[in-house]
Amino acid sequence: MNQSIPVAPTPPRRVRLKPWLVAQVNSCQYPGLQWVNGEKKLFCIPWRHATRHGPSQDGDNTIFKAWAKETGKYTEGVDEADPAKWKANLRCALNKSRDFRLIYDGPRDMPPQPYKIYEVCSNGPAPTDSQPPEDYSFGAGEEEEEEEELQRMLPSLSLTEDVKWPPTLQPPTLRPPTLQPPTLQPPVVLGPPAPDPSPLAPPPGNPAGFRELLSEVLEPGPLPASLPPAGEQLLPDLLISPHMLPLTDLEIKFQYRGRPPRALTISNPHGCRLFYSQLEATQEQVELFGPISLEQVRFPSPEDIPSDKQRFYTNQLLDVLDRGLILQLQGQDLYAIRLCQCKVFWSGPCASAHDSCPNPIQREVKTKLFSLEHFLNELILFQKGQTNTPPPFEIFFCFGEEWPDRKPREKKLITVQVVPVAARLLLEMFSGELSWSADSIRLQISNPDLKDRMVEQFKELHHIWQSQQRLQPVAQAPPGAGLGVGQGPWPMHPAGMQ
């Protein structure tokens, strides 16, 4: 008995857009795709929007579908047809390419034949047409395509079943509306963390011996005429005194689809809770909202999202983020605990090796996100040349939609990037990318009680650095720069760190 053999999906592949698209225009096989001048410099692409113009009679024979098939993003008989996604893929490719320039876009209201006209550029667009490095706004005609995709999104948003309050717990306290931040403000840190009543927890404020530690390690001495080159003095200082690294610092970047990111840095030794709610965490509601010693970080308001549909769907997810996602620091490891009803997916150094499969965070289950010990081991191997790539340290969360998947992260409604600052600094030091200046780094002094094994790792990194320096010409030290390790010169005065 004959059985049909399933067709394997075509893996995505890189295709040069210019020769492929010019060949398609020359082929005349797609209705409306044609040259508009004799020199074959300008061509027209029909550009219908389903929300305004209805389905096309030639919907199955479009340049958008052909590009999706050519790049391996659509396999007939395997993938579900998605004309809006095909159109967005080609639009993004044209926007990024230096070989094409948009000449005319429209008319877009209710035309019988909406279209775009592109110019084939010989040497890329003229300098006057250059765009800012990052443009998060939608161009003309793009909002309709975004809405086409958003219309299909709500049924697929990942929300768990409704949750009832446990009868043994007191009802949560509502925060007075007058204390809410303005709707257009960036992410708000809701005050300093409350002290942990546990006798084992470190007291709030500076750790014991803080001033003595500063006077010992950061005593400036006579300042040289100019600062040493990047990493010349500061790198060994930090490696010999690893407690100077901001081990508890986390850089958090919130991103709503198509909007500029909003970022902040938290320095709480316990971690933080990411949430969106008027419900206030209290000592009596630890089971609902986690420890009050965590930094309380509220998601930014979605009110500046211009698309009504996108803002509606984003609010659908934010409405079930009141319990939040906990990022817990434990030793030199970072963990996540999902309390919220909204499902959360993630990728990062400790994620599953199957990068193409969605990776959910199970509810109320501690999930390891990052290990500094493992990062240091991988950094040592990389510096020795035993691995080809530096160790990863960035962590990405996607709220309410599966991740990783074939959809780019920029198309997700809500994403959050988390970066352990200590890992980023160490990697930048060894790669030479760190620019040391008074405002480039804000050092935070943490508890110096590190494990012996971690101290050995720093010693080995310091040894690697010294070996690298022997292979480079020695720079002439400025007069007065002969300072001992731990004495400076530092680019900021200790008084600025109190």
UniProtKB/Swiss-Prot annotation:
The processes (GO biological process) annotated in the record are: cellular response to muramyl dipeptide; cellular response to peptidoglycan; cellular response to virus; cytokine-mediated signaling pathway; defense response to virus; immune system process; inflammatory response; innate immune response
Q: Where is the composition biased (Pro residues)?
A: 168-206
Residue interval(s) of motif Nuclear export signal: 150-160
Locate the region Disordered.
121-207, 478-498
Where does this protein come from, organism-wise? Homo sapiens (Human)
Identify the disorder associated with this protein: Inflammatory bowel disease 14: A chronic, relapsing inflammation of the gastrointestinal tract with a complex etiology. It is subdivided into Crohn disease and ulcerative colitis phenotypes. Crohn disease may affect any part of the gastrointestinal tract from the mouth to the anus, but most frequently it involves the terminal ileum and colon. Bowel inflammation is transmural and discontinuous; it may contain granulomas or be associated with intestinal or perianal fistulas.
The protein's assembly and partners: Homodimer, when phosphorylated. Interacts with TASL (via pLxIS motif); interaction takes place downstream of TLR7, TLR8 or TLR9, leading to its activation. Interacts with MYD88 and TRAF6.
Localisation per UniProt entry: Cytoplasm; Nucleus
Q: Can you list the GO cellular component terms from the UniProt entry?
A: chromatin; cytoplasm; cytosol; nucleoplasm; nucleus
Which of the residues bear the PTM Phosphoserine?
A: S158, S293, S301, S431, S435, S437, S440, S446
What does its activity-regulation comment describe?
Maintained as a monomer in an autoinhibited state. Phosphorylation and activation follow the following steps: innate adapter protein TASL recruits IRF5, thereby licensing IRF5 for phosphorylation by IKBKB. Phosphorylated IRF5 dissociates from the adapter proteins, dimerizes, and then enters the nucleus to induce IFNs. (Microbial infection) Activated upon coronavirus SARS-CoV-2 infection.
Keywords attached to this entry: Antiviral defense, Cytoplasm, DNA-binding, Immunity, Inflammatory response, Innate immunity, Isopeptide bond, Nucleus, Phosphoprotein, Systemic lupus erythematosus, Transcription, Transcription regulation, Ubl conjugation
Q: What is the recorded function of this protein according to its Swiss-Prot or TrEMBL entry?
A: Transcription factor that plays a critical role in innate immunity by activating expression of type I interferon (IFN) IFNA and INFB and inflammatory cytokines downstream of endolysosomal toll-like receptors TLR7, TLR8 and TLR9. Regulates the transcription of type I IFN genes (IFN-alpha and IFN-beta) and IFN-stimulated genes (ISG) by binding to an interferon-stimulated response element (ISRE) in their promoters. Can efficiently activate both the IFN-beta (IFNB) and the IFN-alpha (IFNA) genes and mediate their induction downstream of the TLR-activated, MyD88-dependent pathway.
Q: How is it modified after translation?
A: Phosphorylation of serine and threonine residues by IKBKB in a C-terminal autoinhibitory region, stimulates dimerization, transport into the nucleus, assembly with the coactivator CBP/EP300 and initiation of transcription.
What are the DNA-binding region positions? 14-122
Glycyl lysine isopeptide (Lys-Gly) (interchain with G-Cter in ubiquitin) crosslink site(s):
K411, K412
Q: Which GO terms describe its molecular function?
A: DNA-binding transcription activator activity, RNA polymerase II-specific; DNA-binding transcription factor activity, RNA polymerase II-specific; identical protein binding; protein kinase binding; protein serine/threonine kinase binding; RNA polymerase II cis-regulatory region sequence-specific DNA binding; sequence-specific DNA binding; sequence-specific double-stranded DNA binding
Positions bearing Phosphothreonine = T10
Mind telling me what this protein is named? Interferon regulatory factor 5
Q: Which family does it belong to?
A: Belongs to the IRF family.
